[in-house]
């Protein structure tokens, strides 16, 4: 069942080094702490104490990020050479402990964020700005006053500081705090502000005039508020004041996107993950505490459950049976041995998406099976393995988005999934309308039922009420399944679910478990190379432009390019790729900016995240989404392996890092050739198009000959190619003119000439549009459809729907063929380790095959994909390449 996005909670942002340094110096006031070997442990002791405190308070910080300082020179240090230079060097004893502390944080499962060239304060400012949650900054640094708002608070370890407290303490608003710092300076960071003007006068100036800029715009008013000496200092130190304000201003845009759900507080005590290290460094009392402390009950952290204790003595009873011992579970399993047993099931997760329990419904009776020690599960791993094996052997399992549940059972309990009987109502909903697949929206759409919204679950006060909610959801799941099976979904689509989509889910699970290996040392080198290159590019760009600004800020870039440099503007002052390409020749920095952006995206999307996501075998396990696109095309996330660039040299460097899992294997890439155009020939039955494919001719050259004649055919082939593909993507003359960079009239003339030469294609496309208008549906090769609502639609919307409908026919049918091909190959090599399907990218399949039999395996896979997938009126064709690295799978 679809799990809700968590909208409530607090994000804790930790000023890591400041916290650790303070702990170290507090411990060093007395005798410096060391272990029995004489190694200093004061900072590590502070870290352990901090984690203990945070774990105790974890309900108030369900999300946590440790912000780190950049290891390279920061922007502020580049602006002011003396920045922070007045600070004493850190003691050697402390420096020895910092790498250990950072390693411990990562081992404990905490998310640590460092951004090259920026301080931890900037990381915190950016994350606090992006955060959808209430945010608490753990620091004593007064610079964070500028961030205070209804959503953001500052906590110094004892006291919470809010926006109103800033007004009360300093007499100014948080938004004025950088102006305040610009005047008074900051001795700890070594910027001066205005010499001789203190907090009292700074407050008066800002209360009267509002900002540093307004003060200097109204010097006659400022003069009346200051002594003559202070006024002279204000005039003299103007440059210092604005530099100080700039240095005090935290960068809120050094991080553009962030997955906040990835930084959930670990469900178990993080210190358990560093027990060996604690022993090595002499934390004996901490180890003793860990051994003596009971495992906490965390049922109350589940998104479906509230934050009250899970156990109570309320007399109210639930209709759910809690399976707390072997006897009732064994009795339940015996009931399943009769034929046609159906079990409606869902996982119960905590806020970190960790599985706590399995809830299921059988013959109108609900059951709750705790699986984690945190819920006092009494069952051994072996007992549960046997129980789930029997359950899947005897019963059909029905759920909404079943893949996570089945993947969990396979990963944790090694339950075989090959011959199980399953039904996924999310797939059924997808086949009825691919744009409505969420459990809540499907219930509302088809059963006119609304579940209690997840965000209101905090109103429940007892364990019984929580279980009752699970019972309500499971019964709703049963009604939804019955709705689809008893007329809510056409019989041909029910057959499609049974014969194609459900087996395909099992193929996807196999691909996810297999994973795609990366060359980790290569990616570590590439990460550093990209870091260095980004730094060089940034310096080159800033030198060419002559202004120091944040290159990652579209707003600042827009101001610099269009206002300072006076480059030709677009209406929205946009700096997206399309806009920058139009002014590419107007300034030498533009090409470098585009290069910087591409590299920065690769760095932040792939190099660093891939190293974080790899497992112990250096494999990346993406998650495939079967119901995520309206056309039926497969998508993936965490990470998105289908989006790894292929057309740029830098993008190919990312693909180069993906390799075969061992020296006995190699990679095989098999790519369908012009699959959408073959479908166009099949559907339209155009004799010229069919003949070209049947005789193996160059289809784009043949089209070019038909349009422009033999003499110009080769020269105009690219235009013919754009028209060929444009038709199946629903492209009109406007889009074609933009694609080819030609006039609208010329684009129209090409399309008219094309349809005049291929009238049967025009007739077919017109028939399809009429059919879409009539039925509000666009059908694929296998009978799937996409739904369009033309009610009240104007001509513009209708035109868009018709283009999308035509596109859905071809993209959806191509998806059908890819699924059939993947199923055929998977069935042919079932339980055969010589062939492993790793990935689908558009019309290409990536396999891992035994190298010793590579030519024979390639030939057999191509034969299946070419000849056994579907009897089109024209042949399917594939090209194939064998290599050791992904980037080499090309001609």
From Swiss-Prot:
All copies of domain 5'-3' exonuclease, residue ranges: 1-313
GO BP terms: DNA-templated DNA replication; double-strand break repair
Q: Which reaction does it catalyse?
A: DNA(n) + a 2'-deoxyribonucleoside 5'-triphosphate = DNA(n+1) + diphosphate
Q: Does the keyword Secreted apply?
A: no
Outline the segment boundaries, as ranges, of region: Polymerase: 492-890
**Pfam families in the record, alphabetically?**
5_3_exonuc, 5_3_exonuc_N, DNA_pol_A
Keyword Nucleotidyltransferase recorded: yes
Domain 3'-5' exonuclease: start-end pairs: 314-488
The record, for Gene3D superfamilies, names: 3.30.70.370, 5' to 3' exonuclease, C-terminal subdomain (1.10.150.20), 5'-nuclease (3.40.50.1010), Ribonuclease H-like superfamily/Ribonuclease H (3.30.420.10), Taq DNA Polymerase, Chain T, domain 4 (1.20.1060.10)
Q: Which InterPro entries match?
A: 3'-5'_exonuclease_dom, 5-3_exonucl_a-hlix_arch_N, 5-3_exonuclease, 5-3_exonuclease_C_sf, DNA-dir_DNA_pol_A_CS, DNA-dir_DNA_pol_A_palm_dom, DNA/RNA_pol_sf, DNA_polI_H3TH
Q: EC annotation?
A: 2.7.7.7
The UniProt GO MF terms for this protein read: 3'-5' exonuclease activity; 5'-3' exonuclease activity; DNA binding; DNA-directed DNA polymerase activity
* Keywords (A to Z) from UniProt: DNA damage, DNA repair, DNA replication, DNA-binding, DNA-directed DNA polymerase, Exonuclease, Hydrolase, Nuclease, Nucleotidyltransferase, Transferase
Q: What does this protein do?
A: In addition to polymerase activity, this DNA polymerase exhibits 3'-5' and 5'-3' exonuclease activity.
Assembly, in brief, is:
Single-chain monomer with multiple functions.
Can you tell me which family this protein belongs to? Answer: Belongs to the DNA polymerase type-A family.
- From the Swiss-Prot or TrEMBL record, give the protein name: DNA polymerase I
Q: Top-down, what is the taxonomic lineage of the species of origin? A: Bacteria, Pseudomonadati, Campylobacterota, Epsilonproteobacteria, Campylobacterales
